[in-house]
């Protein structure tokens, strides 16, 4: 096992005030969901979860169809159900959103699409990105730059990408009527200013609202355990943990890198429940890491805050950033993120 102190990281800046203003508004639907939440008992974190597995629905689709979702950093949001949303209206939505972005730029608002504003908005379905047949189809929204040459029919580079999905979202699907489409997890790669403008259009069009989805240290520990438990044909990355040490005048970060086979051996030594991960096993796994680190460096990691986890399956940061690396476990990663998103909006 290898360990080292990482240089201080610059804290992520808060989202723009425009982004904040949009993502905290309460819609009539949110008020109804809040009413339902108050009438139901609090549901604690499940004491056990299944180890992520491959999805048959995903296997039935050409892997190249969603390969572009991998190895990119996505910012996470939770999303309340969309009112009167229709998959058959994608062409109309593309035109309306394109016009809305053009109008916002004409107002002088910050839109990061280039000076010539020669863009195209595209809505499309992401087949296979779901946990069960009952889950709504995932869909993708992209802002593309148009080619400047009339003879060129190829699309230009992707300026902004966002996708909406629901993976094993039964708990939310059971609480809303047929007028609503439940896609509680929204993932974005692109400028925050564009995210705010596109989010505003969705809010006005579908009576929904977005909220940044942070990942606390407790959930990062679960991710570390579940992803370490996954069987890999070959490991693509070192298993790494990053802890933040609050101190004055500046914070200190501690990075702890472990060979993935060593991490898997450690997990196997504490894992007793076939096919599942339990809270007790997660705690034991993390306690073993803390003990090993303290034995070598005399530092109590339990007094710090876990802020990032990286494995060959995926990496996640407490500020709501995720990067999915292994296509086999794409659905498994999204299932847990959907669970967190549903919990945030219920």
Swiss-Prot record:
The keyword Repeat does not apply. GO terms for cellular component: inner kinetochore; nucleus. The modification Phosphoserine is found at residues 41, 55. The modification Phosphothreonine is found at residue 45. Keywords: Centromere, Chromosome, Nucleus, Phosphoprotein. Pfam families: CENP-L. Transmembrane segments: none annotated. The keyword Cell membrane does not apply. It is found in: Nucleus; Chromosome, Centromere. Component of the CENPA-CAD complex, composed of CENPI, CENPK, CENPL, CENPO, CENPP, CENPQ, CENPR and CENPS. The CENPA-CAD complex interacts with the CENPA-NAC complex, at least composed of CENPA, CENPC, CENPH, CENPM, CENPN, CENPT and CENPU. Component of the CENPA-CAD (nucleosome distal) complex, a complex recruited to centromeres which is involved in assembly of kinetochore proteins, mitotic progression and chromosome segregation. May be involved in incorporation of newly synthesized CENPA into centromeres via its interaction with the CENPA-NAC complex. Belongs to the CENP-L/IML3 family. This is Centromere protein L. It comes from Bos taurus.
């Amino acid at each position: 096992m290898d360990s080292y102190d990482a240089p201080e990281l610059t804290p992520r800046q808060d989202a723009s005030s425009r982004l904040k203003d949009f993502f905290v508004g309460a819609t009539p639907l949110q008020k109804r969901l809040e009413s339902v939440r108050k009438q139901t008992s609090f549901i604690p974190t499940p004491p056990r979860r299944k180890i992520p597995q491959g999805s048959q629905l995903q296997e039935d689709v050409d892997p190249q169809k969603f390969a572009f979702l991998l190895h990119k950093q996505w910012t996470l949001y939770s999303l309340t159900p969309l009112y009167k949303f229709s998959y058959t209206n994608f062409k109309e939505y593309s035109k309306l959103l394109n016009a809305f972005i053009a109008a916002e730029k004409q107002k002088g608002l910050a839109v990061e699409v280039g000076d010539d504003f020669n863009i195209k908005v595209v809505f499309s379905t992401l087949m296979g990105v779901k946990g069960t047949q009952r889950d709504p189809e995932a869909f993708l929204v992209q802002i593309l730059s148009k080619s400047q040459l009339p003879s060129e029919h190829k699309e230009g580079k992707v300026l902004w990408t966002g996708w909406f999905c629901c993976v094993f979202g039964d708990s939310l699907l059971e609480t809303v009527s047929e007028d609503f489409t439940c896609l509680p997890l929204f993932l974005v790669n692109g400028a925050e200013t564009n995210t705010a403008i596109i989010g505003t259009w969705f809010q006005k069009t579908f009576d929904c609202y977005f909220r940044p989805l942070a990942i606390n240290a407790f959930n990062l520990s679960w991710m570390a355990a579940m992803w370490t438990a996954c069987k890999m044909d070959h490991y693509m990355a070192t298993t790494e943990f990053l802890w933040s040490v609050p101190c004055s005048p500046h914070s200190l970060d501690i990075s702890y890198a472990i060979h993935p086979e060593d991490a898997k051996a450690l997990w196997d030594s504490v894992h007793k429940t076939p096919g599942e991960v339990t809270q007790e096993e997660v705690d034991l796994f993390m306690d073993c890491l803390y003990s090993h680190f303290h034995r070598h460096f005399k530092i109590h990691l339990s007094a710090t805050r876990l802020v990032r986890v990286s494995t060959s399956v995926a990496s996640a940061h407490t500020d709501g950033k995720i990067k999915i690396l292994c296509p086999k476990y794409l659905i498994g990663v999204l299932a847990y993120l959907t669970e967190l998103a549903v919990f945030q909006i219920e």
